[in-house]
């Protein structure tokens, strides 16, 4: 399994960095116009709403005592008008922000996916795929509302506070100061709770990621689980991971649930002080009933945006951990990329040279040590040797899926690190042992490497590699849906479709890495004619477990101990009676004993 297993938490020790939010703001800039409109609509609607207590004050102090029905009805009409305007503005603002939020999700997810497409194999080797998947889907969904509605609501609630404070001071300065006395207490409380919340929600992020990684792995490996009767053991592991999620979630929610009661407690204390002071001052005749009612209303209004800001604060703290993970992925270096002055690879003739190449996947073991060889255009080369010797590594370096640690890989005399990756790989046909089939129909899978291929070209390629026979018998022929990962196909059928896909791309260099491992011997013999057609005129590298399939190769290289131990034709190596001879005769003995 990947080095970062489902049991390992992804640790982020750095304190919250405001630069995360500043960087995230780049996704908001293109929608700034619509967001400004939304802010203005909400701001104007809110301002109208905060006039209501002053209207009520006038009704209590002027219209009702003087029995001025005309003024009273006018004030009531104003209240109704204010309500209608607020509802209209709020509805328009909501529609705008739904659109903005979905656009932000699209932009972040697109950038994240495009970056993942460019990351080298090493990145995927080191991480469970479930942990990558949760960032693209769940985390982006979580932060999108924070970046759209969250930021707008901060601005709006700050405006609301400003309007309320202004109106409070317009009504009565002394009583307004009493309302504001609770703000310092609130600031101390919010600073205390912030760090505890962030650490708690980071733990939630980690445990959810671990659970998702384990779940994804077990869904893919469900058949193996049942074959080895591992259901009970896997259920126990899943239960432990789920309990970790539950425990960290409960801890995080406990901290989050402190925010609202904390703010509410401060609010209640302040409003109680206002009420008591109002009773005393009203009794002394220094404050009117309308003033007391108005300032009490504004005191209630004052704490509402603060409570809303507390909720927004909660949401921000919850999602900052997700935002960090998203940017952590976006900042993952693309180690295999085009050089600054990379040129387009000319049409490949097929000469491949390894010039003193050294390579290791990590520092613990050197896979290739000072490897040098040259393959002429059109030559077929077989790579043989024990498991883990470096055969697949060699073909991966030719395709530039990894960078060499030392030396050079050249094609037609051109250092492949100095050409664009796209122009290199579009001229290569690479077929791995794991023949990946995408969801969709068979025709789309064969056309994958050549989107403009005609139906006739697809059928001809399939016939050449003996795939047309079984495809024609499928329920809908080439339009048959193969489901996710080609689940309705056998391994042999997947490999034949992959052969057709590779042949259709008409590569100059062909790489077959255990490409016939899942094909039965009878089909492989029938396929041999098609393979010969594929190899003709193309430089090819073949890794095969069944050595009988590579006897006719122009050159066979025995790879072991980080280098080329032997090289020559089948007859030459058999005559030497060295490494290849021992491997071939041992395999031949196994076949004879079995049959």
Where are these regions (language model features)?
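Membrane-integrated ABC transporters
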Residues: 1-49, 64-75, 93-97, 101, ...
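Juxtamembrane loop-to-helix connectors within ABC transporter transmembrane domains
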Residues: 19-20, 28, 93, 97-101, ...
């Amino acid at each position: 399994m990947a080095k970062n297993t489902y049991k390992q938490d992804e640790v982020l020790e750095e304190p919250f960095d405001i630069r995360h939010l500043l960087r995230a703001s780049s996704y908001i800039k293109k929608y700034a116009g619509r967001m400004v409109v939304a802010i203005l609509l909400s701001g104007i609607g809110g301002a109208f709403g905060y006039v209501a207590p002053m209207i009520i004050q006038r009704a209590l102090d002027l219209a009702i005592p003087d029995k001025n029905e005309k003024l009273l009805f006018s004030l009531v009409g104003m209240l109704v008008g204010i309500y209608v305007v607020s509802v209209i503005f709020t509805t328009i603002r909501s529609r705008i922000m739904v659109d903005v939020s979905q656009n932000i999700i699209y932009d972040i997810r697109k950038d994240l996916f495009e970056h993942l497409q460019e990351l080298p194999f090493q990145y995927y080797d080191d991480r469970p795929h479930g942990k990558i998947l949760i960032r693209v889907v769940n985390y982006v969904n979580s932060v999108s509302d924070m970046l759209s509605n969250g930021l707008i609501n901060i601005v709006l609630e700050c405006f609301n506070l400003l309007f309320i404070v202004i109106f409070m001071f317009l009504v009565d300065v002394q009583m307004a100061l009493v309302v504001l006395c609770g703000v310092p207490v609130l600031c101390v409380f919010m600073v205390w709770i912030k760090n505890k919340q962030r650490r708690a929600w980071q733990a939630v992020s980690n445990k959810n990621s671990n659970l998702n990684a384990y779940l994804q792995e077990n869904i893919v490996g469900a058949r193996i689980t049942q074959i080895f009767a591992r259901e009970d053991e896997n259920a126990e592991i899943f239960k432990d991971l789920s309990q970790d999620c539950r425990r960290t979630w409960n801890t995080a929610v406990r901290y989050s649930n402190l925010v609202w009661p904390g703010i509410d407690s401060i609010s209640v204390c302040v409003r109680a002080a206002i009420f008591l002071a109002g009773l005393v001052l009203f009794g002394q005749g220094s404050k009117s009933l309308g003033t007391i009612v108005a300032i009490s209303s504004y005191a209630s209004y004052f704490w509402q945006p603060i409570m809303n800001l507390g909720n927004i604060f909660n949401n921000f703290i919850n999602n900052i951990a997700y935002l960090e993970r998203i940017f952590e992925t976006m900042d993952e270096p693309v180690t295999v990329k085009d050089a600054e002055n990379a040129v387009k690879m000319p049409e490949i003739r097929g000469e491949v040279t390894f010039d003193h190449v050294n390579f290791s996947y990590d520092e613990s073991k050197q896979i290739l040590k000072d490897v040098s060889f040259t393959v002429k255009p059109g030559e077929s080369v077989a790579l043989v040797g024990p498991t883990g010797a470096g055969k697949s590594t060699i073909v991966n370096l030719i395709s530039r899926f990894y960078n060499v640690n030392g030396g050079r890989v050249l094609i037609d005399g051109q250092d492949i690190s100095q050409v664009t990756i796209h122009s290199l790989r579009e001229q290569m046909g690479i077929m791995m042992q794991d023949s990946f089939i995408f969801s969709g129909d068979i025709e789309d899978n064969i056309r994958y490497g050549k989107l403009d291929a005609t139906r006739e070209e697809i059928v001809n390629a399939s016939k050449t590699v003996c795939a047309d026979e079984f495809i024609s018998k499928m329920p809908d022929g080439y339009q048959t849906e193969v489901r996710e990962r080609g689940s309705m196909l056998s391994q042999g059928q997947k490999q034949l479709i992959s052969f057709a896909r590779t042949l259709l791309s008409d590569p100059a260099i062909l790489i077959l890495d255990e490409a016939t491992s899942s094909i039965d011997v009878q089909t492989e013999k029938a396929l041999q004619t098609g393979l010969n057609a594929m190899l003709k005129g193309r430089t090819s590298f073949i890794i095969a477990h069944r050595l009988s399939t590579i006897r006719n190769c122009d050159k066979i290289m025995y790879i072991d101990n980080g280098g080329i131990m032997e090289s020559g034709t089948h007859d030459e190596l058999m005559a030497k009676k060295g490494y290849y001879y021992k491997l071939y005769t041992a395999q031949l003995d196994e076949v004879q004993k079995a049959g």
